[in-house]
Amino acid sequence: MTTHTQDIGKEVSSVIAQSWHRCSKFMQRETWQAPHQAQGLTFESICRRKTALLTIAQAALEDAWEFMDGRPCALLILDESACILSRCGDPQTVEQLAELGFRDGSYCAESIIGSCALSLATMPGQPTKTSGDQHFKQALHPWSFCSTPVFDNHGRLFGSISLCCLVEHECVSDLSLTLAIAREVGNSLLTDSLLAESNRHLNQMYGLLESMDDGVMAWNEQGVLQFLNARAALLLHLDAQASQGKNINDLLNLPMLLRRAIKHARGLNHVEVTFESQHQFVDAVITLKPIVEEQGNSFILLLHPVEQMRQLMTSQLGKVSHTFEQMSTDDPETRRLIHFGRQAARGSFPILLCGEEGVGKELLSQAIHNESERASGPYIAVNCQLYANSVLGQDFMGSAPTDDENGRLSRLELANGGTLFLEKIEYLAPELQSALLQVIKQGVLTRLDARRLIPVDVKVIATTTVDLANLVEQNRFSRQLYYALHSFEIVIPPLRARRNSIPSLIYTRLNSLKKRFSSSLKIDDDALAQLVAYSWPGNDFELNSIIENIAISSDNGHIRLSNLPDYLFAERPGLETASSLLPASLTFTAIEKEAIIHAARVTSGRVQEMSQLLNIGRTTLWRKMKQYDIDASQFKRKHLE
C-alpha cells in the first residue's frame, strides 16, 4: 500500500490521493478490466430518463467539437452514476477509448477503472483532472481525462461532461473547457426546467380559468383581447378562438359604466351591467381589475352570471318550512283550506288570500309554496304597508346602475323562479300596482330609471283584510290588478269559526314550546275548554301568544284554569262567543239553517265550497236551501262592471 502511494506524483489533489488510498486496498495496478456495460433495453431506459441532459449536452458538445479544429480528443456525456451516455470527437480517439471498454453504456466506476476523473467528478461533485501516472491503473497512464459535474435546478448531481485525449495532446485549458460546457448545460437545464414549470403553472391557470363558472376576459391597453374563456364566450355569444386578437370594442358594445372605468383605470366590484353582443342584450354582474404597468394598463374582467348570483342570494334569504301536513285536519274549515290550497299550488296563477288579521294567511301561503313546483325556489315576503307610497319603489322595483352606484335587484327579481308573498296588498302604491300587474300579465319588469324589460317568473300570493272590490269602486285600487288577483280567491275564516281545530292548535303550540324550553307541558281539561270557548278576536296569532304566556307563567309546566288571564272569561260586546254561536233554545231545524247560512257567508255563496264545508252533497244542499228559502247569490261579493 505504501509503495502504491509513493508512486503518485508529488503535486496531486487530496481527491486523487484519497482515491489511490481506496483503490490500493482491493485492486492491482497492473491488471485492466473493461467496465461493465448496460446494453439493449436497459441502456435505452437510462437514456430516456436522461433525455433532458442528452438533448442539451449533445448540442453543446457538437458545437464545442466544431471549434476544436480536428483536435485528437473525445467528448463524453455521463450520468450521475458515471455511465457513458454519448460520445463525440475524433473517430480514432473514440475508437482507442472503445478498445479500453469506454463505450456507450459503460459504467466508469472507481471500483472498476480505479482513480480517474471520469469517476471522481461524480463523487465529490467538483471539476477533476487526472493525467498520466495520476491514474491508479497503468492502462490509463497514456491518457488525460478532464471531467466537470452538471447539476440540476435543485442543486443535485445530474451528470458530467468529460474530455479525453492522449497525454501528448492535452492542453492546460481542457478542464476549463469542460467547466464552461457543463455550466452552459446546467444553465440550459435550469432554463428548460423553469420554462416547463412556468408552462405547467400556466396550463393549471388556464384549466382553472376554463373550469370557472364565471366568465373571464383579459385585454391590453389598446383593447386587444388576449384571453377569453369558454364561459365568457358562451355568455357573450362569441367564438373564443376567433375573438382573441381582436379589439374588444369591435366585438361588444360595452356599457357606459364599464367604458368610463376602463378610461380611468378604475376597478369595479360586482356591478350589474348589460352588454350588447351579436344584436342581443346580455345581463351580467361584473368585476373589473385594472393592472397598472409602466408599459400601459391591461384589464381583467370577471362576468358573474346574473341567474347564478340571484340563486345564491335567494337560497340564503328565501326558505320557508310550513307545509299542509302541519295543519290540523280536525275542523272541516281547515280541511277546506288544505283542499283549495293544494289546488292553488298546481298552477302559476296569482292567488288572493282573504281573512281577518292573524288567521294564518302567511302560513297558508308558505304551505302552498312548499306544495308547488317552485318549492326549491325562493320565497320572498313583502309587507305592502312599507310601499304605501312610491318613495321605496326602488327597493320594490329595483334600479339601473349609474356612474355613482350599482344597480339594485328588485324584490320581484329576488323572487324569480319562486313565490312572491304580498302581505296587505291593499296598501301597495298605485305606481307599484302597475308594475306588479305587468309582471303578472306579461312576466316582465321595468326597473326604475331603466327602459329595458327584464323577464321575471314568479307566483304571486297576495293577502288582504279588506274588501278589495270596495276599494276598486272608490278608485283606491287597480281594477285590472283586482281582476288578476281575484281569479283564485281563498277566504280563511276566523278562528271562532274553526273551533274544532283549536285543541289541535293548542297542542301543536305546546309541543313547540316543549322543544324550546326543554321541559314538559300539560293542560287541564277545564282550561282547554275555556280556551275553546273564547272568541279569539286576534285569531291564530292571539292564540299562539296567549299559549306561550300561560305556559311561561304556569307552575312546573302544568296549565290550570287559574293560569288563564281574566279577559278570557269575560264576553266582549260585539264578538261571537261559543254560547252565542249555537244557543240552547234553537231547534235542530234552526241549527241546520244557521249552519247553511254560516257556510254561505264563509264561502261567499259558492255552492260547491258550501257542500264541501258542510260535508253534504250539492243536490241535498240545494234542497235544504230551497226548504229554508236561502238564496246563495245574496252572499256573493258584488261583481264589478
UniProtKB/Swiss-Prot annotation:
Domain PAS as annotated: residue spans: 203-265
Per the record, which residues fall in region Sensor domain? Answer: 1-318
**What positions does the entry give for ATP binding?**
355-362, 415-424
In this chain the GAF domain maps to 52-189
InterPro entries in the cross-refs: AAA+_ATPase, GAF, GAF-like_dom_sf, Homeodomain-like_sf, HTH_Fis, P-loop_NTPase, PAS, PAS-like_dom_sf
What are the residue boundaries of the Sigma-54 factor interaction domain, all occurrences included? Answer: 327-552
Q: Which domain of life is it from?
A: Bacteria
- Record keywords, A-Z: Activator, ATP-binding, DNA-binding, Glycerol metabolism, Nucleotide-binding, Transcription, Transcription regulation
**What processes does the entry annotate via GO biological process terms?**
glycerol metabolic process; regulation of DNA-templated transcription
GO molecular function terms noted in the UniProt entry: ATP binding; ATP hydrolysis activity; sequence-specific DNA binding
SUPFAM superfamilies, per database record:
Homeodomain-like, P-loop containing nucleoside triphosphate hydrolases, PYP-like sensor domain (PAS domain)
The record's annotation in PANTHER family points to: PTS-DEPENDENT DIHYDROXYACETONE KINASE OPERON REGULATORY PROTEIN-RELATED, TRANSCRIPTIONAL REGULATORY PROTEIN
Function summary: Transcriptional activator of the glycerol utilization dha operon.
Name this protein carries in UniProt: Glycerol metabolism operon regulatory protein
Organism of origin is Citrobacter freundii
Q: Which gene encodes it?
A: dhaR
